Structure formats: structure tokens, C-alpha cells
Amino acid sequence: MSFVLAIDQGTTSSRAIVFRSDISIAARAQAEFPQHFPASGWVEHEPEDIWTSTVMVCRDAIAQAGISAKDIAAIGITNQRETTVVWDRATGQAVHRAIVWQDRRTADICAKLKADGREPVISEKTGLIIDPYFSGTKVAWILDHVPGARARAARGELMFGTVDCYLLWRLTGGKVHATDATNASRTLLFNIHTGQWDDELLEIIGVPRSMLPEVKDSSARFGESVPDLFGGAIAISGIAGDQQAATIGQACFRPGMMKSTYGTGCFALLNTGTTPVVSKNKLLTTVAYQLDGKRTYALEGSIFVAGSAVQWLRDGLGIIKHAAETGPLADQSDSMQSVYLVPAFVGMGAPYWNPRVRGALFGLTRNTGPAELAHAALESVCYQTFDLWAAMRADWPSSETASVVLRVDGGMTASDWTMQRLADLLDAPVDRPVIQETTALGAAYLAGLNAGVYPEPTKFADNWRLEHRFKPNMSEATRERKLAGWARAVKGVLASDEGA
């Protein structure tokens, strides 16, 4: 039997999962690593921590599976997107800590780009908005704030990469400087229409082309690991950013299929096929995956607060001790009350993109208690998903006639209550898969596809297994009343922003 090793390098931990040829899991390992917050709004990682934790979990997973390097057909990598590393081409030493996707230090750079009228051309070419979230301005900041870095970059001495690229470079002993199209599409430097780094974008943001990696298919022979890492060389044959990898792991290969990943926040992607749809509703247009030189696109929406709303119930209010208590508690709520939580704890993401507003509760009465607050917190995740759903269907009219499928993954999907309410408010089935490790599975599939372990996408999709389908069970009148109440609550929060 052949095995595939998936590296899932995340924001707070590195994970490795060994998949069998039938996509069942043979072993898994995880290791957390330190977070660094040197200033307000700044988030950094030590690149060496990313590297050492990744190697450690790979070795642990291989040992747990009772296999050796010769049994592993390929390695697939998936990663926290946008996080930026710049290192010395000769020594391999990072010139600065990795600047994490959450980091907001480049807000002034972004504001200047907008003030200079650069957003239309950047958005048209990249499908993104100008925001510190993305890699390009992070690279520019490093070049301008590390002494001598910009001059060194101009001389070709420095390399840039997202986390996948950095790991690939280290795994191959510094032989391969490459990334895939999904990660490239999150940099503000990549033209999603041509599939290439864009000279105009590089000039606008101030990043030398010599720093950039080669962009390849998501399933491709990137190189092989140096033998002394895992007891033998292993082909590295698949790379994708974490949300795109989850889309692949959910087998969302048909246009109109949509996945939502629920963790601290929520990321939803809608497959739009070979057409890059330009959003008119503040969604992002991104590369879902690239196979055989052909790009498949997606609309993406980001929700900042999903699972963290439940954490707030536990840590902020103290009304629960464990997340699993929220569903039963919500079931006890008074059906006559209409309490809405708009959880804009750190502003609002798509489709509103307002970083200034803050959260609010609406509809409180003397009888409002823990059950009603739990109900409102769980429903807020569903309402926010509905907003993304509605924006996506407005941006891509084909979804009105296509068979729209919502597949969910992430820790919060363990809540049957939340998933049922999600189906009710979307008026669409919500599918929860048997394999919840969808992000790692996506990376494994891309690697295994290139290595000949896994079949082409349509056949792989046949192996996707449903654990539970949540079917809508709410009257149209109730659904419309509840959604109208949510819309009023959001309007109230947005109106509270003096800059609105």
C-alpha cells in the first residue's frame, strides 16, 4: 500500500497526517509553536519555529504509522496563507520574523495605495482588495524596515515566499524556490488572469521580481526532500493554501459547489469554474486550484468571528464551560424572544469590510438570559454565512440555476444545532463529511494525484463520504422574519460607525 504525507502548517500549530491510498488516516501528529506580538496589531512567527515544528510532526507521524520513507509516495503541503517570509539566498537565514496574515502593520501603506488611486488596477488584476491581510505590502515593509534589505533585494540576494514556499525550499535543501497558483494569488503581486507575476503590480507595491518564486500547478513535481530528513528522499508533489486545500478535500470540483470552514472565524469558497468572477459585493476572487495549467476560480468570503463567539460565551461571559454546551443551552431559549448578536468584536469581514465597528446585542428583555445569548451567538454564525451566501449568488448568477451544495468542515460543525439552523436559514442542505481533516486531505490528494496514488478529480469526488445531511426545516415566513431582524441589527451596527 502507498502512503501520502500531508503537511498542514497552520497559524498556531504544525500538523502532519499520513493518508493511506484509500484516503483513510494512518497517523497524525501536531505541535504548537510560539506566537509573537511585538506591537499592537502586529503578529509574527519565527521561521525556524515553523520549520522545526514541521519536521518534528512529520517524523512523529511517520513513526506512528509504522512506515518508512520508501513507503511514502509523495508529500503534500498546505499552509496558512499570506504569511510572509524573506530570507537570504546564500545563507538561508530569514532577515526578519515571518509577518503573519493577521498582522495589520501595513495599514498605512495600504491607505496610501488607495489614496494614490491604485485600488482599481490592483483589484482588477488580483481579484483582491487592498488590505494588510495580503503578502505584497508585508514584503515591502520588510524591505523598507530591515537595514539594507531593499538594496540586497535589488542585487538579487533575498528571496520571498509564503509558508509553503519557505518549507519547500528547506525540505529540498535550498534547491527549489517555488509556490503554487493558489498561494501566489494571495500576494497582491499575481495576475490571476494571466497566471503570472505582474510587473505593474510589482512596481506599484515595490517588490523586485528577482525575489519571487516560480509558480506551478497545485499538483506538480516540485522536488524531493533531502534524504537525511526522513530517512530517504520523498517526492513533494502537491501544494495549496489552506482554504483552497479544504475546498479540494471537500471535493468541490463542480461550479456552484461551496464549502465553509468553521474555526475561530469562517472562510467560504464558491467554485465558479474557469471564469474569474469580479465581485460587486466585496467578495474576493481567487484561484481555487490549478491543474494541468488550467486555473479554476472561486469567490471567497471571510467571517472574522465564528467559533470565537462561543469562546466569548465561555471566557467573556462565563455562561458555559465547554463549547458542546451551547447547543443544548440554545434549545432552552424562549422562542418568543428575538435576540440578535452582531459579533463585530474585531470589525466586520465580508461582505461589509468595516474594521471600525464593534459588536452589539439587539432585542434584550428582562427575560433574556444565558439560553438566549447562546442561541444568539450560534445563530450569528449562520446569519453571517447567509450574508456570504447571498453575496455569492448575487455575484455569480449561475448559482441560481446550478445545484448549489454547501459542504462544511472545522470544529464548529460538530454542533448539530448550528448546522441545522444553518440549513434552515440558507434554505439549502448542509453536508458534513465523514473525514473532517479536509485541509490535510486536500494537500494529500494533490500530491497523490501527481504521484499516481489518487485518481483524477471526478473519480476522487466519488470517494467523498457524507456523515450527515442537514435539511431545511423552517417555514419561509419564519426564515424571512429572522433574516429581516438580522439585517436591521447589522444596519444598526454599521450606523454606529462615525466613518460610515
Swiss-Prot record:
Signal peptide: none annotated. Keywords: ATP-binding, Glycerol metabolism, Kinase, Nucleotide-binding, Transferase. ADP binds at residues 11, 15, 264, 307, 411. CDD domains: FGGY_EcGK_like. InterPro entries: ATPase_NBD (IPR043129), Carb_kinase_FGGY (IPR000577), Carb_kinase_FGGY_CS (IPR018483), FGGY_C (IPR018485), FGGY_N (IPR018484), Glycerol_kin (IPR005999). Its EC number is 2.7.1.30. HAMAP family: Glycerol_kin (MF_00186). This is Glycerol kinase. It comes from Bradyrhizobium diazoefficiens (strain JCM 10833 / BCRC 13528 / IAM 13628 / NBRC 14792 / USDA 110).
